[in-house]
Amino acid sequence: MKRKLDANDVPSTEANEAEEVKGADRDEDFETLNLDPRLRQALVKEKFSKPTPVQAKAIPLALEGKDILARAKTGSGKTAAYVLPILQTILQKKAIDPSMKATTGLILVPTRELAEQVQKVITTFAAFCGKDVRSVNLTQKVSDAVQKAMLADYPDIVVSTPARVIANLGTSALSLENLTHLVIDEADLVLSYGYEDDINALSKAIPRGVQTFLMSATLTAEVDTLKGLFCRSPVILKLEDKDDHGAGVSQFVVKCAEDEKFLLTYVIFKLQLIKGKVIIFVGDIDRSYRLKLFLEQFGIKSCILNSELPVNSRIHVVEEFNKGVYDIIIAADEQEVLGVSKSRKSKDATEGDDELLSDEDEETSAKAASTRTDKRRKLSSKEKDYGISRGIDFQNVACVLNFDLPTSSKSYTHRIGRTGRGGKTGMALSFVIPADKYGKHKPTSISSAKHDEAVLAKIIKRQAKLGHEVKPYHFDMTQVDAFRYRMSDALRAITRLAIQEARAREIRQELVKSEKLKRHFEENPEELRQLRHDGELRAARIQPHLKHIPEYLMPAKGKKGISNEDVGFVSLRKTGPENRIRKARDRNRGRGKKPGRKIDPLKTFNRGRK
């Protein structure tokens, strides 16, 4: 890859010549940032009172025209940190030349879900700008002809994955001649998601002198590569929040057998041991359906996120989860667990970044992926634009349940970052398979669990360096074992064929919801709100008795939590509205007959013939 040249045809300088900023002042407010009144009005509407640390530092520097490389985690407000300066610049140019039509902002993201998220932020902040600001999301599933028509009107901002940008540059549908701002969000993921060739081609198409924003949760070798390609002496922002790296997250680990993962999950949700919204991370797509079908046996509703589902369905699931419609999401983090991300040693020493990733940690991750061939290691187009443990902004998550432990401490940190955000507390619970229990229960076994103990050691070591403790959690197995026979009944019903049927059925259902009804839902948004993704798949044999817990199985402390003490009077016969059919029969009995005169029964006997 060639490094980008500056105005004097000299390669851009390294980090030691770049200005570096750490920390953030919290006395700033949006009034001091001199933003356009229309942008401030949008901020007030969205109840943005004070900028977050990354916004307070990045926005003034961006308005000065400096390149920025910012390390800030998901949920820190980094999207607004680059969207607001871009909108401010566009509005200033439109004030001078209202007829200006040119694509001046390009925002690159690794996944479709993140592209949709960024597009919504732009729409929110540009709500009072009228027709002065137009943006387009190129990751939408539309035909090339429709996409070409969208770009023909020269939108001010284009949000896309690198692959879609290159495709539209190749057809001349997209022009970057007037580009002034380039953003690469989740920069550390862009190259590891298989966009290296696209980024290399894009670096040659970007005009000289473009202001660049690189936003990343970590400063890795991938970010260093992008910095060399696109940045000119960037200001490096390393912002530490008080809740960074999971400071507000209580971390627990449970060592158990492979089938006991399902047993403990059943007990946790059926006895309501965890209150609030939960994200369950599993290792692959089959595991997600096995767990969903298992929970269905007990009447526990959940919805699935994986790369097979249509992007519109995935986005809708996240939106509804954030609104509180669903409490449990089962997320298939197959990219990470299967090792599809490229394993590269971090050049943190050159950045001075305390990333705390040891060589041993990289080796452990590499071992878990050693069975994969180089061909398999390359992302398919289906997996390429999907990611769940990074980028997507889940809100108000009470607990992250690592049903399958990730293969590296870095991935673990990203997963638990879904909870305990914005100063709130959260919990992370991880199931770990000891080496002597691995492979004992074939139907529920997963290959990545072979290295659980080694990965756990790295996780504990890394969290200790960050000042956090991973505590063991002990269930009272004498009480849990009482539920074991019910767990065994449920697991036996979930065969491999049932999982295949469930996968096929849900994909068919979601395709109908996503494609055929898209226009209908645009015209009828109320019906979209009623669309649910946590329905029963019914691929496995449902055993009705499993949905109810007999009183003799209930622990003494748990009875009050999930049952009402005063049941009230229950009559032998139904008296409520559900008995309307019987009442109607009683009312209608005798109707329709002709009213006759009263007959004396003693005078109705006919005398027989002699």
UniProtKB/Swiss-Prot annotation:
Compositional bias of type Acidic residues: which residue ranges? 351-363
Q: Which family does it belong to?
A: Belongs to the DEAD box helicase family. DDX56/DBP9 subfamily.
- Residues where ATP binds: A72, K73, T74, G75, S76, G77, K78, T79
Question: What's one GO-annotated cellular component?
Answer: nucleolus
Originating organism: Emericella nidulans (strain FGSC A4 / ATCC 38163 / CBS 112.46 / NRRL 194 / M139) (Aspergillus nidulans)
InterPro entries for this protein: DEAD/DEAH_box_helicase_dom, DEAD_box_RNA_helicase, Helicase_ATP-bd, Helicase_C-like, P-loop_NTPase, RNA_helicase_DEAD_Q_motif
Record's comment describing the protein's domains: The Q motif is unique to and characteristic of the DEAD box family of RNA helicases and controls ATP binding and hydrolysis.
**A GO term, aspect molecular function:** ATP hydrolysis activity
Basic residues composition-biased segments:
582-596
Please tell me which stretches of this chain the record labels as motif DEAD box. Answer: 185-188
Q: Where in the cell is it found?
A: Nucleus, Nucleolus
Protein's UniProt keywords contain Protein transport: no
Would you tell me the protein name for this molecule?
Answer: ATP-dependent RNA helicase dbp9
Span of the annotated motif Q motif? 28-56
